Design a protein with these regions (language model features):
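Signal for well-folded cores of large energy- and translation-related assemblies
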Residues: 16, 34, 49, 62, ...
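Alpha-helix N-cap/helix-start motif
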Residues: 41, 117-118, 149
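Cys/His-rich Zn2+-binding cysteine-cluster or related metal-binding knuckle/ribbon modules and their
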Residues: 2-8, 17, 27-92
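S-adenosyl-L-methionine-dependent methyltransferase catalytic core, i.e., the SAM/SAH-binding region
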Residues: 8-17, 27, 33-36, 76, ...
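Long C-terminal interaction/binding lobes of large macromolecular proteins
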Residues: 129-198
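Residue-level signal for pocket-adjacent positions within structured domains
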Residues: 28, 43, 56, 68, ...
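Extended interfacial segments that mediate partner engagement and assembly in macromolecular machines
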Residues: 26, 75-140
Length: 198
């Protein structure tokens, strides 16, 4: 037996489809939205629709942006000869919070995972290799320390090493299986400073 009406159930069901939102959180969000003033709900809806319509990949690093180039790639003060490779935009954001990394990024949008059917062709690896045809001194591989992240790091290392470009891997300190977005800035900074050559 349903406790709530069809519209409430539909809203809860849709919200629970979001990553990290379970049934109870979806219910709390649904009731919060229902109790919001109409103008606020309309503003939230417009903001989500505008974001979906206008956010795309940066043509250089493939992070999410609303312009052709993200603010980092468009910044000439950044070191464009050093590229940090991360799995997701949220990992890039975690390193930016340290305020110490001055290079640019490349977002793969995942990691190699044969168990999930994700191979190199499903990631932005080909685009990374094309970027390396420019004047690049170092590629820092900052994938997660999970099995998939390590597999991706080794694959990239073997692919890039023959080009003569220095390839480094962030140091440990990031727990095995840990997601970078949840690691504090100090640990990320030590991992970056202690990176090792592959």
């Amino acid at each position: 037996m349903d406790i709530y009406s069809g519209h409430i159930n539909k809203l809860i069901e849709q919200l629970s489809r979001l990553p990290g939102v379970g049934a109870k959180s979806a219910q709390r969000l649904a009731f919060h939205i229902i109790n919001m003033p109409q103008e606020e709900v309309e503003k939230l809806t417009r903001t989500m629709l505008d974001a979906k319509a206008n956010i795309r990949y940066c043509k250089e690093c493939f992070t999410l942006t609303d312009k052709d180039l993200c603010p980092i790639c468009a910044n000439n003060a950044r070191d464009h000869k050093t590229i940090m490779v991360v799995e997701h935009t949220r990992d890039m954001a975690a390193y930016e919070k340290t305020g110490k990394y001055e290079g640019v990024y490349h977002v793969l949008h995942g990691a190699i995972s044969p168990m999930l059917g994700i191979g190199p062709g499903d990631l932005k690896i080909k685009e990374l290799i094309l970027r390396l045809e420019k004047d690049v001194d170092e590629v820092i591989i900052a994938t997660n320390s999970s099995l998939e992240g390590e597999t991706t790091a080794m694959y990239l290392s073997r692919l890039i090493k023959p080009t003569g470009i220095k390839v480094t891997r962030i140091a440990s300190g990031v727990p095995v299986g840990g997601d970078l977005e949840y690691i504090d800035e100090g640990t990320l900074l030590r991992a970056l400073e202690g990176r090792t050559q592959l």
